[in-house]
Amino acid sequence: MAYCPRCNTYTEHSVSIYHQGKRRELAEGQRRYNRKLKGYGSSPKPKQKRFAKVNKKISLVLTCSKCGYKLHKSLGRMKRVELV
């Protein structure tokens, strides 16, 4: 049970792990970045020598069973997440 702001009640929610979508090559920021990489010279951003973080931040997607409203909840940093 979780609170749904659209239904304004506590309803059953299905839980899934959020996965990032595919990057769009034609997005303005991506085209700008590709122009900067073109030609001679180095990358506009410094390359990281060693990893500062060893795990990713996990985000859950709660989907309301009544109206289908999706809610994101952050779980913080974890090495492994398993939904049962």
Curated annotation (Swiss-Prot):
Subunit composition and interactions: Part of the 50S ribosomal subunit.
Cofactor(s) demanded: Zn(2+)
Protein name, entry field: Large ribosomal subunit protein eL42
A Pfam family of this chain: Ribosomal_L44
Gene it is expressed from: rpl44e
UniProt cross-references to InterPro entries, sorted A to Z: Ribosomal_eL44, Ribosomal_LSU_eL42, Ribosomal_zn-bd
Record function comment: Binds to the 23S rRNA.
Any one annotated GO CC term: ribosome
Chain residues that bind Zn(2+): C4, C7, C64, C67
GO molecular function: large ribosomal subunit rRNA binding; structural constituent of ribosome; zinc ion binding
NCBIfam families: PRK05767.1
